[in-house]
Amino acid sequence: MKIIAKKDLFINDEIRVREVRLVGLDGEQLGIKPLSEAQAIADDANVDLVLIQPQATPPVAKIMNYGKFKFEYQKKQKEQRKKQSVVTVKEVRLSPVIDKGDFETKLRNGRKFLEKGNKVKVSIRFRGRMITHKEIGAKVLAEFAEKTQDIAIIEQRAKMDGRQMFMQLAPIPDKK
């Protein structure tokens, strides 16, 4: 059953059609009934008559407890929002002539970001005449990728953009 937003649902007295295809409480088909008879059946069961498919011919109405239905729907929406994870891109900036200790610190930070599930953009900024030695920058990026290959995959290979060379790493998805 496709869930429709409240503004599209018609309940009990809001329904303005002559006859409906009626679906019972347990989902069983009760056939095509006049609206008055369908409302009487819903009243006898002490529940609501909800028009769930107004475009169908004849429109489909279901006998259900609308309050409970609305609560379950909101609960499901809340669960879906909880399950959504926001992936952010963190940046680690390096230099083509980076010292070993500095490189290890940047590598440790990059690994922390990846372990938390974030993507990491590793960028190298070329200053002055360093731009003539792009291979040194590529070597630094390759070393960074090699040392994080156990927890990350290369999402975007090293490429130049102006005076910067960058690559993007993503955490390895969990294998379930």
From Swiss-Prot:
Sample GO molecular function, one term: ribosome binding
InterPro entries (UniProt xref): T_IF-3_C_sf, T_IF-3_N_sf, Translation_initiation_fac3_CS, Translation_initiation_fac_3, Translation_initiation_fac_3_C, Translation_initiation_fac_3_N
Keyword tags: Cytoplasm, Initiation factor, Protein biosynthesis
Main localization of the protein described in the UniProt heading: cytoplasm
Signal sequence bounds: none
Origin superkingdom: Bacteria
Classification via PROSITE patterns: IF3 (PS00938)
GO cellular component: cytosol; membrane
Biological processes, Gene Ontology terms: ribosome disassembly
Function: IF-3 binds to the 30S ribosomal subunit and shifts the equilibrium between 70S ribosomes and their 50S and 30S subunits in favor of the free subunits, thus enhancing the availability of 30S subunits on which protein synthesis initiation begins.
Quaternary assembly: Monomer.
PANTHER family found in the cross-reference section: TRANSLATION INITIATION FACTOR IF-3 (PTHR10938), TRANSLATION INITIATION FACTOR IF-3, MITOCHONDRIAL (PTHR10938:SF0)
Family the UniProt entry places it in: Belongs to the IF-3 family.
NCBIfam families assigned: infC (TIGR00168)
Protein name: Translation initiation factor IF-3
Source lineage: Bacteria, Bacillati, Bacillota, Bacilli, Lactobacillales
